[in-house]
Amino acid sequence: MTDQQKSDILQGTLDLMVLKTLDAMGTMHGYGIARRIEQISAEALAVNQGTIYLCLIRLVQKKWISATWGVSENNRKAKFYAITKRGQKQLAEETENWERVAGVIGKVLELAPARSK
């Protein structure tokens, strides 16, 4: 898949995907989180490094994740992130909201008549 074919992440969904990734995978560094999201999406989503780090800063400020310094698998200093109890609660709320919105959008798409070409 080319870079042009990769989808931008829907606004407001990156927080949800980061929280879910940390909840499922445990403590990870920012690059690892971004790569995991890309892998799970079969490379359909491209996670910009600048975007992921702004997201991580925002989630730390909201106390949905915590950050600690450590050493990465390639022996480099890196900041590692973990979901907090508050983050787990937020993940549950955002997941419920996402499922509701996705269901509504699905209904609209099913009901909308197809246009002739």
Name what the model sees in each region.
Residues 83-87:
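Accessory beta->alpha helical hairpin/"wing" motif in late/C-terminal subdomains of nucleic-acid enzymes
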Residues 60-77, 82:
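Beta-hairpin "wing" of winged helix-turn-helix
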Residues 7-8, 63, 115-116:
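Short, contiguous hydrophobic alpha-helices characteristic of membrane insertion segments
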Residues 8-51:
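N-terminal helix-turn-helix DNA-binding core of bacterial DNA-binding proteins
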Residues 52-59:
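Basic amphipathic alpha-helical segments that dock to polyanions
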Residues 1-7:
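Short, Lys/Arg-enriched N-terminal segment that forms or immediately precedes the first helix
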Residues 88-117:
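Amphipathic alpha-helical dimerization/coiled-coil segments
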